[in-house]
Amino acid sequence: FDQYINLRPARLMPGVIAPVVRRDGSPRLPGEIDMLIVRENTEGEYSSIGGRMYEGTPREIVMQETVMSRYGVDRVLKFAFELAQSRPKKHLTSATKSNGIAITMPYWDERVAEMAKAYPDVKVDKFHIDILTAHFVQRPDFFDVVVASNLFGDILSDLGPACTGTIGIAPSANLNPSRTMPSLFEPVHGSAPDIAGQGIANPIGQIWCGAMMLDFLGYRAAHDA
C-alpha cells in the first residue's frame, strides 16, 4: 500500500514513571518527553536485494543491499520537515551514520541539507545513530521530530517510547500521505498473552492509534475528544 511513513509518537503520560530522570535526579513530568519519530518505511536497509553464494562452505558469502532513492528519501524528509514546522519547537533531528556508512548515509545527509533550504524556520541538527541513542536516554526532552532511515527508525521508535516508561502504550501509524492507498494504525509493540482475560490490559495504545487515525482522516474534533 506504499505506506512510506511510519510515524511513532513517544510521550510521557500522566501516571507513568519515566526510567530516565533529569540530570539532577528529579523525576520527569508528564509531557516533558514529547517527540515524534518519522521512519522511512518502504526502502533503505530493509530491501530484498542480495543473496547467498557457496552456502555451507568455507567460501560462503552473504550480501544484502541498502536502497535509497531520491524519490523515497525526499518524500519522507518532506513529511518530517512539514511535521516539525507545524509544532511549537520547529525542531528536526536527522539520524545518520555518515562517518562509517560511506555511500548511502552521506547521500541521506545531502538530501536533508537540500530539503532544509525550503524550511528556513525549522531548526535542523543531525547526530550519528550511536550518540543519538545515548542522547535519547540522557536528554529525551531535547527532541521534537526525529527523522530516520528504515533501520535507524526501527531502533529509535522502540527506544523513544521505552524512555517514557513503557512501549506497551505506544501507538503507530503506517501512512500513505498522498492518500492514494490505505493507511494503517495499530499499537505495534507486541502482545501480552499472559494477562489475557484478566481485564488489566492497558488500552491507551489502541485509543491513541484511533485518535491518530481520526486526525489523519480530518476529524480533528473527534481526535481532540
Describe the residue ranges of each PLM region.
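Glycine-rich phosphate/nucleotide-binding loop
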Residues: F1, F136-D224
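Structural signal for hydrophobic packing residues in well-ordered secondary-structure cores
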Residues: F1-I5, R39-T42, F81-P88, T96, ...
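N-terminal glycine-rich phosphate/adenylate-binding segment common to multiple enzyme folds
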Residues: F1-M63, L151
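A generic local secondary-structure boundary/capping motif
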Residues: A18-R28, F81-A84, T133-V137
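Short acidic, glycine/serine/threonine-rich loops at helix termini
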Residues: P19-R22, S47-R52, I103-W108, F136-R139, ...
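Phosphate/ribose-phosphate-bearing ligand recognition and processing surfaces
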Residues: G50, E65, K78-S86, G100, ...
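Glycine-rich phosphate/diphosphate-binding loop of Rossmann-like nucleotide-binding domains
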Residues: T57-D130
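Active-site rim loops that border cofactor/substrate pockets in soluble metabolic enzymes
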Residues: P106-I155, P187
